[in-house]
Amino acid sequence: MISRTDIEPILEAIPAARQEYARHYGVHPYFTRRPANVVRAYLERFSEEGDVVLDPFGGTGVTAIEAFLLGRRAIQNDLNPFANFIARNIADTTLPSTAPLRQAFERVEQ
């Protein structure tokens, strides 16, 4: 776990690299989407493998998917059902296997 004294701010600009992530994030032009490489840089700086990342305003899941790809666990939600639909479908086609996650989610839903 990263302690408060270990946190160093990101001082350099992180240019958005939208093109290299088009395969899984170019599915739909959602209005609040953030560049995945910028989200990834923050996750790498401010979390460690195995940490839980919470994104309560998850949109189409960029933060959650990048967290999973970096070995973090993630919780994401959005008020917009369309955003959740997009996030679920991107996760289903991007992540190796979401079956255990989906089963856990369905148990929590019940």
Regions found by a protein language model. Name each.
Residues 1-110:
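S-adenosyl-L-methionine-dependent nucleic acid methyltransferase catalytic domains
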